[in-house]
Amino acid sequence: MKENLKNVHVADMISILKDVDGYITSFNSDISLPNRTLGIDNSIEEKFYVNTEGTHILSRVPRVSFHSIITANHNGQLSAFSIPAGYAGLGRSGGWEKIKSFDLSSYIPEQLVIASNSIKSKSEKFEEDIDVIVGPDIAGLVAHESCGHPFEADRILGREAAQAGESYLGFDCNGTKIGSKEVYVSDDPTIPGSMGFYLFDDEGVESKKRKLITAGIITDLLHNRETSSKMNIQSNGASRSTEFDKEPVIRMSNTFIEPGNYELEELISDVKSGVYIKNFMEWNIDDRRENQRYVGFEAYRIKNGELDIHVNSPV
């Protein structure tokens, strides 16, 4: 942490948010932006963990993030969007210097242009089957919702069924083919600067990268000490608590699809007719995580290997 969050005043955050609001209200377009909800969060998570094994762990993880929800009016039609799209915000673990690294003075105007074009775009109807390419925002959400949560072993055992839902997996799912050989999904809390960063979980177990899916085969689940003991393996450090007086439960950290060997341009060049959905503004998923629905925000028609016009809200 280069710039201590304890030295950041409310006035500093308000000043940045006023600047951001100025970028939005001065945006020259034929859509109006009558309502803006903007926020900056910062926190220092401090933990001191002690157990009967003789473990003593002190950790401090600072985090900062920027969030926004903006209402747009185009020809009397209201819609909401966020910058960045998808409501997740811009976030990092680190000091106040991370907010500066977002370069909001350039980022916000660039995203407003994209948002304006997306809102004004028209829907496309396809009679035939088409190829769909999704951007990192949607790929990350798919990894989170369809791999992260259903791979939490306590959920698989029915521990959270009444509140958080169930899983489509069984406890004996290791070795099951779940995707093509191109699919690699990991969960890694050790990535420096990430929002999901931690070095020890809340049962005192050292964190590590968990390879959930390898070449389309399920190879690991997210475990705490209890669920791992039921499988006669070691916990992989996924037990986490929101507060000191709350029971730790199994939760993912940074869950993602591993990069492959193709660049985006190469993927697009192979598509004769399709859609590239870069990000999203709406999604739904069932309690067992089997079925999901994603509605694109910034999206483009693909024709003969090239990006074409904007497409409105592809599903």
Predicted regions, residues:
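Active-site bordering "gate/hinge" segments
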Residues: 1-198, 205, 214-217, 304-306
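Dual-mode signal for accessory low-complexity, basic/Gly-rich regions
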Residues: 161-315
